[in-house]
Amino acid sequence: MTIDLNCDLGESFGVWSMGNDAAMIDLATSVNIACGFHAGDADTMKKTVDLAKARGVSIGAHPGYRDLHGFGRRPVVGLSSSELENLVAYQIGALQAIATMAGHKVTHVKAHGALSNIACDDDMTARAIASAIKAVDPDLVFVVLANSRLVAAGEALGLSMVHEVFADRAYEDDGSLVSRRKPGAVLHDADAIAQRVVKMIQSGEVVSITGKTIKMRMDTVCIHGDTPGAVEIARALRKALKDNGIAVAPFKTAK
């Protein structure tokens, strides 16, 4: 049994620092790098790509809405399908250019924050993200929230997909993530999170915030780099996976 561990990194901006990227990148097998719209800048992107290359970690673009003040967690309404496609393609291309400079390669794309949340329920947004990925590079892997509209969008365009579950987020009964505005949406107990994820992987099921069991395919588990205690959570999870005979490897080998 094998699983990929992914983390959202490169989310600092200028002199403002977010998370402990150097520590998290040692614990992840793939990382998603902010591309300057919700967070990140050219220098931060380059630094993060350099770290990933040095550690042999796969990198992906993490495009979001243009919303630095809100960290990409606020919806941007009224965008057309073509505007959404351009927004996503622009950010993928930015990271590809930085990666080329660093001698590394972008392997996947995972939407961020409100862009991802909306796409999980809205076919037009989901299709726009998938279309942008295919137009830029059809070999890029599409990281999708398991059981969401993103899955159908990726399938329709023949994209390779990796189904994602979250270590540090609670789930609603319909398989969607509990809104960050609600109590209990973000989990913080490292040991409890680690044991929860082990059970998820072993059973292929997620338990919702009300106790409902939901079947999900899971190829990769996300730990948010900006979650307080993220490093401790990642370390506890790596240990729990090892103790339970679950190998950790980049998603291209995940089953």
UniProtKB/Swiss-Prot annotation:
GO BP of this protein: carbohydrate metabolic process
Top-level taxonomic group: Bacteria
Keywords assigned by UniProt, alphabetized: ATP-binding, Hydrolase, Nucleotide-binding
Pfam families noted in UniProt: LamB_YcsF (PF03746)
Catalytic activity: 5-oxo-L-proline + ATP + 2 H2O = L-glutamate + ADP + phosphate + H(+)
Gene3D superfamilies: Glycoside hydrolase/deacetylase
GO molecular function: 5-oxoprolinase (ATP-hydrolyzing) activity; ATP binding
Assigned EC number: 3.5.2.9
Enzyme class: hydrolase
InterPro entries on file: Glyco_hydro/deAcase_b/a-brl, LamB/YcsF/PxpA-like
General function of this protein: Catalyzes the cleavage of 5-oxoproline to form L-glutamate coupled to the hydrolysis of ATP to ADP and inorganic phosphate.
Assigned protein family: Belongs to the LamB/PxpA family.
Subunit organization: Forms a complex composed of PxpA, PxpB and PxpC.
Protein name per its UniProtKB record: 5-oxoprolinase subunit A
Native source species: Nitrobacter hamburgensis (strain DSM 10229 / NCIMB 13809 / X14)
